[in-house]
């Protein structure tokens, strides 16, 4: 056993779980205490995750803060966790956005508040494990366990009448895709006798086995991203989820599929990954163009951002399967950027919904006149969403396009069209909401963002600018892990 309790990764992992057990002891009637305690636990978890970044050695591709112990002796299964440059920032993004989720729910959740907060702390624990476990079986367990609290968040605390249908749709779509992954996992275990990721990376499966296993993993990861045509559940889940649910869904859950491709599909099944690259590129281009055009037809603000997420994740999958350093690093940066930008936009939509109880775009116009601070934030985040220079999305998209240009110039051309469509729906969105004449007939009063809402949005804005102006502070941490991934692929 190699277990150090003062390991920052152990502290980051266990803090939300300990918080759950303590929160269970607090009476449900003491809502203020429940809120404050959950907030302090989430802040403490974030501070521990910052220690990971501070102590992280960017000059190596090895897993750091590793811990291993035997958890299932009969099958010789070990519980192993550790992080590299790929997983580091996903953990940081998770711990940051959980704070935003708790703060944005401060006054909007009126029923079963303690249970709601417990769901988010459990979700935080599960997501940290997803990004840190180095065992295929453990990854699968946590990967699927995330569905349970998310199902409850959408189905119990959703904002509209179709929330139950949306929750079941989300649950069933993702579960069915993952059943194939379970069969593949069992096949791998019976072939190799292990589920240790660091051993599986160096086992050469036959080409036929790789194709079968890759497709099984693809079925699970493609639903999570989601790729066309597995995206049907996403707009409905976003439309029905509470604001915090949409933040965690867009900010973190969609990244689990991309992370799965990077951590498992590419290094374990390199031959199959190369074989299916044209297939992935085709689906990605369809996602970019179809989702961008569909976005222009939406009237629900949440569905607009949901479809734009499908388009952005199309760029991510192009970058991942470009199989070069610009593509890998660009896709990771783009996922991190999308996690910040889409979360910020959903938070802005939540600001409007909390005040006016509608997300239908036709009711909004000229808000810059009565909500100037909100208007500035919404304008900035919308520009970040379209990939404006100086924002985080710009760097990620440029790296992805550079990577695709090395492979197929036609692919790059059509992907660039997606950026043009993205600019079109982004400009249309903020022009419709922020500018124009104020529609006084629909609302009796207007209120700009509160101090609490300001402090939720400003850290996201700062990070988006930081990533856009000084991307090397992130790329340097990612680089050696990305190089190591490409070396694993090249050893076929």
Swiss-Prot record:
> What EC class does the entry list?
translocase
Query: What superkingdom does the record give?
Result: Eukaryota
Kindly state which keywords UniProt assigns to this record, in alphabetical order.
Electron transport, Membrane, Mitochondrion, NAD, Respiratory chain, Translocase, Transmembrane, Transmembrane helix, Transport, Ubiquinone
Under InterPro entries, the record lists:
NADH_Q_OxRdtase_chainM/4 (IPR010227), NADH_UbQ_OxRdtase (IPR003918), ND/Mrp_TM (IPR001750)
Which Enzyme Commission numbers does its entry carry? Answer: 7.1.1.2
The region annotated as signal peptide is none
Record bears the keyword NAD: yes
GO cellular component term of the entry, any: mitochondrial membrane
Q: Which PANTHER family does the record match to this protein?
A: NADH-UBIQUINONE OXIDOREDUCTASE CHAIN 4
**Could you identify this protein by its name?**
NADH-ubiquinone oxidoreductase chain 4
Organism equals Chondrus crispus (Carrageen Irish moss)
């Amino acid at each position: 056993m190699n277990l150090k309790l003062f390991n920052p990764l152990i502290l980051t992992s266990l803090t939300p779980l300990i918080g759950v057990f303590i929160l269970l002891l607090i009476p449900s009637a003491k809502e203020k205490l429940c809120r404050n305690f959950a907030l302090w636990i989430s802040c403490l978890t974030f501070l521990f995750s910052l220690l990971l970044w501070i102590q992280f050695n960017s000059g190596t591709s090895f897993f750091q803060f590793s811990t291993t112990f035997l958890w299932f002796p009969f099958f010789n299964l070990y519980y192993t966790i550790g992080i590299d440059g790929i997983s580091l920032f996903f953990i940081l993004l998770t711990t940051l956005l959980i704070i935003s989720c708790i703060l944005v729910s401060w006054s909007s959740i009126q029923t079963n508040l303690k249970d709601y907060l417990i769901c988010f702390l459990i979700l935080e624990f599960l997501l940290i494990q997803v990004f840190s476990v180095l065992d295929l079986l453990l990854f699968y367990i946590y990967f699927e366990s995330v569905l349970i609290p998310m199902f409850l968040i959408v189905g119990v605390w959703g904002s509209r009448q179709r929330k139950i249908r949306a929750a079941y749709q989300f649950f069933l779509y993702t579960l069915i895709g993952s059943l194939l992954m379970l069969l593949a996992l069992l096949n791998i275990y019976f072939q190799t006798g292990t589920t240790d990721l660091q051993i599986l990376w160096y086992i050469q499966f036959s080409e036929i086995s790789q194709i079968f296993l890759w497709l099984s993993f693809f079925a699970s990861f493609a639903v999570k991203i989601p790729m066309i045509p597995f995206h049907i559940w996403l707009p409905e889940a976003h439309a029905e989820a509470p604001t915090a649910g949409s933040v965690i869904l867009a900010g973190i859950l969609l990244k689990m599929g991309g992370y799965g491709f990077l951590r498992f599909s590419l290094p374990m099944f390199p031959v199959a990954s190369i074989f299916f690259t044209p297939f992935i590129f085709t689906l990605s281009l369809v996602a970019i163009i179809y989702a961008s055009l569909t976005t222009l037809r939406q009237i629900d603000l949440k569905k607009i951002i949901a479809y734009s997420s499908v388009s952005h994740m199309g760029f991510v999958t192009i970058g991942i399967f470009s199989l070069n350093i610009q593509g890998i690093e660009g896709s990771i940066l783009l996922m991190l950027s999308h996690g910040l930008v889409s979360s910020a936009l959903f938070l802005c939509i939540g600001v409007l919904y909390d005040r006016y109880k509608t997300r239908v775009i036709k009711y909004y116009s000229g808000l810059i006149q009565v909500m100037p601070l909100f208007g500035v934030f919404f304008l900035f985040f919308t520009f970040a969403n379209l990939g404006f220079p100086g924002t985080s999305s710009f760097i990620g998209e440029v790296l992805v396009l550079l990577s695709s240009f090395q492979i197929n110039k036609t692919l790059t051309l059509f992907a660039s069209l997606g950026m043009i469509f993205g600019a079109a729906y982004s400009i249309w969105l903020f022009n419709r909401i922020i500018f124009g004449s104020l529609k006084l007939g629909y609302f009796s009063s207007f209120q700009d963002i509160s101090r609490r809402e300001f402090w939720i949005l400003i850290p996201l804005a700062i990070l988006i600018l930081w990533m856009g102006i000084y991307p090397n502070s992130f790329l340097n941490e990612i680089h050696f892990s990305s190089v190591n991934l490409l070396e694993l692929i090249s050893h076929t």
